[in-house]
Regions:
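Alpha/beta enzyme core
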Residues: 23-30, 63, 76-109, 114-287, ...
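N-terminal amphipathic alpha-helix/helix-capping segment at the start of soluble metabolic enzymes
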Residues: 1-79, 84, 117-126, 274
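PDZ domains - specifically the beta-sandwich core and the conserved carboxylate-binding loop
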Residues: 289-291
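A short, acidic, flexible beta-alpha connecting loop/helix-capping segment that sits on the rim
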Residues: 321-327
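Hydrophobic alpha-helical scaffolding
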Residues: 43, 265, 295-296, 328
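Histidine/acidic-residue-rich catalytic or RNA/ligand-binding cores of hydrolases
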Residues: 297-303, 327-336
Length: 350
C-alpha cells in the first residue's frame, strides 16, 4: 500500500486530520458498497440503470467499496492525438488505452466513440465502457470552445457500454444549447439502462478576474454541479475547487454570504464538500478530475487530490493524463496509488 502521509509531506496533518465544521457528514449520502440499494433506489431510474451502476461498483481494485477509479482518454479529440500521445505512441492504438485501464484495475474506461468502438468486441465484456458523446476539438480555427455531439446514445448502447458521458460548458454562450442536447441524451440513456456522467465544466473569460481563475472556485463549480444533477447526471465530474468567491469577483448571478462564512472554509476538503453538497448532498456522486500531467509531482498531486475527494465525501477520481503520458508500468503504479487512498480505512470522511 502507498505511504499516503509520506507523500503528502507537510500537508499531511491539515488533510488527514481535518474535521469539517461546515456541512456535517451525517447530512450526506456517502459512497459505500450499498450505495445503489441505499441511495439510487429512491430515484426514478429503470432497474437496468441500477444494474449498470452496480457493475461499475463491482469492477476493478475498488470493486465492492462504492468508490470509482476511471481512466478517461478522450484527449485525442480534445487536445489533439499528437499532443496527447507523442510521449507514448502506443496509445495511438485504442487497444492499449483499454489495456491500461484493465492492468490498473480501474472500474471503467472512458473514451470516444471511435476508440471504444474499434475494440468493443474484444473488450466490452472485460471492463465497463463509458462512451463520451460530445467533444471540443481544436482543429477548427479560430477555436470556439464549443461541445459538438460526435455519437448517439444508441451507438454507445449497441457497443455494450454501461455508461455515457458528456461535457457542458456552463457559463458559455453555447451552454443553453448544450443543456438541451445533453438533457435529451441523458433521458434516452436512462431509458436504455445506461448510467450518465456529466463533465460539468465552466467556460467564460469573465471567470478570470484580477489574475485569479474562478473556473475552479467552489461557489461557481458548485452551481455547475447543481445544474448537472438537475438534468439527470448520476455522476458529476468536476475540477477540484482551488479557490472560492467567484460570484463576488465577477459580480454576477446570485449567492449568499453564508456560503463563505458557514458552508465553506479555506481548507480544500471543505471546498470540495461544498461541491458535493450541490450534487444533491451526494445523491449524484462527485468524482474529481486528476488534472494535467506535471512531471515529477504527478504522484503526490494525484494522491493529494484523492485524499481531498474521499475525505470530502466524494466518490472517486477520474485520472487520465497523469497516467497515459507515462510508461504503462508507471501509469499503472500511479493509478494504483490513487486507488490505495480509497482502500485505506485510515483515510476517513472529515
Amino acid at each position: 500500500m502507498t505511504d499516503i502521509a509520506q507523500l503528502l509531506g507537510k500537508d499531511a496533518d491539515s488533510l488527514l486530520q481535518h474535521r469539517c465544521m461546515t456541512i456535517p457528514a451525517d447530512q450526506l449520502y456517502l459512497p459505500g458498497h450499498d450505495y445503489v440499494d441505499r441511495v439510487m433506489v429512491d430515484k426514478n431510474r429503470p432497474p437496468a440503470v441500477l444494474r449498470n451502476m452496480q457493475t461499475l461498483y463491482n469492477t476493478g481494485r475498488l470493486g465492492g467499496t462504492g468508490y470509482l477509479s476511471i481512466l478517461p482518454v478522450d484527449q485525442g479529440v480534445e487536445h489533439s492525438a499528437g499532443a496527447s500521445f507523442a510521449a507514448n505512441p502506443l496509445y495511438f492504438d485504442p487497444k492499449n488505452i483499454v489495456e491500461l485501464a484493465i492492468e490498473a484495475g480501474c472500474n471503467c474506461v472512458a473514451s470516444t466513440y471511435g476508440v471504444l468502438a474499434s475494440v468493443s468486441r474484444r473488450y466490452a465484456h472485460r471492463i465497463p465502457f463509458l462512451v463520451k458523446l460530445n467533444h471540443n476539438e481544436t482543429l477548427s480555427y479560430p477555436t470556439e470552445y464549443d461541445q459538438t455531439l460526435y455519437a448517439s446514445v444508441e451507438q454507445a448502447f449497441n457497443m455494450g457500454a454501461v455508461a455515457v458521458g458528456a461535457t457542458i460548458y456552463f457559463g458559455s454562450e453555447q451552454s443553453r444549447r448544450q443543456i438541451e442536447e445533453i438533457s435529451a441524451a441523458f433521458e434516452r440513456a436512462h431509458k436504455l439502462g445506461m448510467v450518465t456522467v456529466l463533465w460539468a465544466y465552466l467556460r467564460n473569460n469573465a471567470f478570470k478576474k484580477d489574475g485569479v481563475d474562478y473556473h475552479v472556485s467552489a461557489d461557481l463549480t458548485g452551481q455547475a454541479n447543481h445544474l448537472a444533477a438537475t438534468i439527470g447526471a448520476d455522476i458529476v465530474k468536476q475540477k477540484m475547487a482551488e479557490n472560492n468567491g467567484g460570484y463576488k469577483a465577477v459580480n454576477f448571478g446570485y449567492t449568499d454570504d453564508r456560503v463563505y462564512s458557514k458552508l465553506t472554509s479555506d481548507n480544500p476538503i471543505d471546498l470540495v464538500r461544498y461541491q458535493l453538497a450541490n450534487c444533491y448532498m451526494g445523491r449524484a456522486g462527485l468524482i474529481n478530475s486528476g488534472g494535467a500531467a506535471g512531471g515529477e509531482t504527478d504522484l503526490t498531486d494525484a494522491v493529494r487530490t484523492a485524499v481531498i475527494n474521499k475525505r470530502a465525501g466524494g466518490m472517486g477520481l477520474i485520472l487520465g493524463r497523469k497516467a497515459f503520458k507515462k510508461s504503462m508500468a508507471d501509469g499503472v503504479k500511479l493509478i494504483n496509488a490513487v486507488q490505495d487512498v480509497y482502500l485505506d480505512n485510515k483515510v476517513t470522511i472529515a
